[in-house]
């Protein structure tokens, strides 16, 4: 998850990162 988050952060697409984590947690 952190790797994807990191890659998305580099693209400055934090929303996608947050959405990915949210989906993974099932919230």
UniProtKB/Swiss-Prot annotation:
Molecular function (Gene Ontology), one example: serine-type endopeptidase inhibitor activity
UniProt note: pH dependence: Trypsin inhibitory activity is stable after incubation at pH 2 to pH 10 at 60 degrees Celsius for 1 hour.
Does the keyword Repeat feature in the UniProt annotation? no
KW Oxidoreductase (keyword) present: no
Q: Name one GO biological process term.
A: defense response to Gram-positive bacterium
Keyword field: Antibiotic, Antimicrobial, Disulfide bond, Glycoprotein, Protease inhibitor, Serine protease inhibitor
After translation, how is this protein modified? Contains disulfide bonds.
The record's temperature-dependence note reads: Trypsin inhibitory activity is stable after incubation at 90 degrees Celsius for up to 2 hours.
Quaternary structure, per UniProt, is: Homodimer.
Q: What else is known?
A: The monomer may consist of two smaller chains which are linked by at least one disulfide bond. On the 2D-gel the determined pI of this protein is: 6.6.
Role noted for this protein: Inhibits trypsin (IC(50)=1.25 uM) but not chymotrypsin or papain. Has antibacterial activity against S.enterica ATCC 10708 (MIC=5 ug/ml) and S.aureus ATCC 25923 (MIC=5 ug/ml) but not against B.subtilis ATCC 6633 or P.aeruginosa ATCC 25619. Has no hemolytic activity against human erythrocytes. Is not toxic to mice.
Q: What is this protein called?
A: Trypsin inhibitor 1
């Amino acid at each position: 998850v952190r790797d994807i988050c990191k890659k998305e952060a580099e693209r400055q697409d934090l929303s996608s990162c947050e959405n990915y984590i949210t989906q993974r947690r099932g919230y």
